[in-house]
Amino acid sequence: MKIGITNDHRGVKKKQLLTIFLTDLGYTINNYGTDTEDSVDFPDYAYKLGRAIQNNEVDLGIAICGTGIGMSIVLNKMKGVYCAKVANVSEAILSKSHNDANVIAISEEMDDFTTKEVIVKFIETPFSNVDRYVLRNEKIKDIENA
């Protein structure tokens, strides 16, 4: 599985941690973020990951900034990109099992243990295919295409 990771200047260390962690688990990582802690504009880096999702360059995405909120706002403006701003394991699981999210946005302030747990649960959780969630996600796509 290919996973894209993007980040702004505040997420460099967290990206480095996750790149090593996920590579050790056997995932292929594509880097769409900055590698420097010099101030950058997060929309530029969110957009790079969003385009990678749209072009099927990666299967899933991880976006890291100060809070995760800015990245999630940008990513959710992009057709076919469904980003969940997640703060805990439960939200990571539900973002996939109910909402079929293909990108997760996290805060660089999340502790490393929780970060690893959240990311693994996001990657490993399948969409449930329960009728009500399928219908709700179809409605989201209808709104997206309106």
Locate the predicted segments by residue.
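Short active-site oxyanion
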Residues: 2-3, 57-61, 80-82
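Short, conserved beta-strand edge motifs with alternating hydrophobic and charged residues
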Residues: 6, 30-32, 61-65
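C-terminal binding/interaction regions
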Residues: 6, 10-13, 89-146
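Short helix-loop-beta junction
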Residues: 21-29, 80
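A short beta-strand-loop structural module common to alpha/beta enzyme folds
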Residues: 28-39
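Mid-chain, well-packed structural core segment of small domains
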Residues: 64, 69-108
